[in-house]
């Protein structure tokens, strides 16, 4: 056998894909943004509140200004593939963080294959991908919490390599 065996505990997978739309105001615009996310994922989105008042933008503290959805499993791979197709499978190296996560934005949701509805309008959105290896839950669970070793963590280089291998992506400087 010439093929090298791979340790299943070292394989990297998507822990979750977070899709975020900031409407910058509560009310009808936020509801329309929530409708777009619901059409895209089939899940009910959650609203996010502003942390502080920014007078120049007209945002008050605790005002609902954004919606987001967390997707995991097979659906996360499908949505990520669709979003990367819009970006032509090219990401900047600065999109990757040191802890193995990466994110990028899309300017128009109609590029993802959703039909344009004049009542909704056009929204841009951000995609954040959190990568993990098996055993990551050890550091998150409530009972018998422990540290994850350095070999088991996902770093920026691992995330870049995973992106290039799984999606045949291109890293741009």
From Swiss-Prot:
Instruction: Give any GO molecular function from the UniProt entry.
Output: structural constituent of ribosome
Pfam families, alphabetized: Ribosomal_L5, Ribosomal_L5_C
An example Gene Ontology CC term for this record: ribosome
- SUPFAM superfamilies linked to this entry: RL5-like
Q: Which InterPro entries match?
A: Ribosomal_uL5, Ribosomal_uL5_C, Ribosomal_uL5_CS, Ribosomal_uL5_dom_sf, Ribosomal_uL5_N
Which GO BP terms apply? Answer: translation
**Record flagged with keyword Hydrolase:** no
**Record-linked Gene3D superfamilies:** 3.30.1440.10
Keyword Ribonucleoprotein part of the UniProt annotation:
yes
Where, subcellularly, is it found? Nucleus; Cytoplasm
Record's keyword terms, sorted: Cytoplasm, Nucleus, Ribonucleoprotein, Ribosomal protein, RNA-binding, rRNA-binding
Question: What does the sequence similarity comment in the record state about its family?
Answer: Belongs to the universal ribosomal protein uL5 family.
**Alphabetical list of PANTHER family matching this protein:** 60S RIBOSOMAL PROTEIN L11-RELATED (PTHR11994)
Outline what the protein does: Component of the ribosome, a large ribonucleoprotein complex responsible for the synthesis of proteins in the cell. The small ribosomal subunit (SSU) binds messenger RNAs (mRNAs) and translates the encoded message by selecting cognate aminoacyl-transfer RNA (tRNA) molecules. The large subunit (LSU) contains the ribosomal catalytic site termed the peptidyl transferase center (PTC), which catalyzes the formation of peptide bonds, thereby polymerizing the amino acids delivered by tRNAs into a polypeptide chain.
Q: How does it assemble?
A: Component of the large ribosomal subunit.
Name the record gives this protein:
Large ribosomal subunit protein uL5
Designated gene of the protein = RPL11
